[in-house]
Amino acid sequence: HLPQVSSSLHSRAATSVVDLNGNEIQLHDMLSGHYLTTANAPVLESTALFNNNNNFNHDVVNGLNRDPSPTFPTKQAVKKDRHSKIYTSQGPRDRRVRLSIGIARKFFDLQEMLGFDKPSKTLDWLLTKSKTAVKELVQSKSTKSNSSSPCDDCEEVVSVESENVTDHSKGKSLKANNKCKEAMDSHQAAAKESRAKARARARERTKEKMCIKQLNEAIVLRNHQFEVSGTREAFVHPVFGFHQQNYGNTSHENWDQSNFASQSNQLCAIL
């Protein structure tokens, strides 16, 4: 429940101007200190908070963020390599060298024996002591480059290796082909032999069939001849009696024997 305000305050409040511009509310005469009492302090605090909140929302809408803390954390800068590089024919090289355990132990033992305090001095001593070997290496490299380039040497090595590989593969392929040919020849020989045996067996079977057929035909023919001869003997006139019948029978039997002998001779010739 708000306390009553005097008539002068009402008259001043009537003349006060409330301007609504976007989200901002401007209070002119209501915020003057000599018209307010201590009882109106909570109301003024709430209006001040409302104004601050509206101002913050207006700034956010317009793209202004007054929060001092950054929204996204910035990435840390990458630490640059402060060591200078040495440029060689194969590109830049780092001055720092990583040694294996055995080589590092030998290197530092040599450094302690020489009494040097820096590894570069030890390396300088090693290079000066190996000047002759370095010169010989440079001379050998120069002679090789004049005679044939390293690429040519590599190509020769690769060609020799490829020839060896091809020869080896050719030898293997020839051996495999020879084995296959031998197997095929043996298989073909066995097949030819089996076919020859089959043909021989077929010829023997046909001969047997022909012999059996001819024998059957001869037997049928002989039986037919016996039947014909029996009918002829039934019509013989009994003039001379027994002697004439015997003559006819003997002649018929002689003819049958000669015929059968000729047929047997033909069968033997076929076999």
From Swiss-Prot:
Record key words, sorted: Developmental protein, DNA-binding, Nucleus, Transcription, Transcription regulation
GO cellular component, one term: nucleus
Pfam families associated with the record: TCP
GO molecular function, one term: DNA-binding transcription factor activity
InterPro entries cross-referenced by the UniProt entry: CYC/TB1_R_domain, TF_TCP_subgr, Transcription_factor_TCP
Region of interest: Disordered: 64-85
TCP domain boundaries: 79-137
Subcellular location, record wording: Nucleus
Main localisation: nucleus
Keyword Nucleus: yes
Function: Involved in the dorsovental asymmetry of flowers. Retards growth rate and reduces organ number in the dorsal region of flowers.
PANTHER family registered for this protein in UniProt: TRANSCRIPTION FACTOR TCP1, TRANSCRIPTION FACTOR TCP4-RELATED
Protein name: Transcription factor CYCLOIDEA
Annotated organism of origin: Antirrhinum cirrhigerum (Snapdragon)
Originating gene: CYC
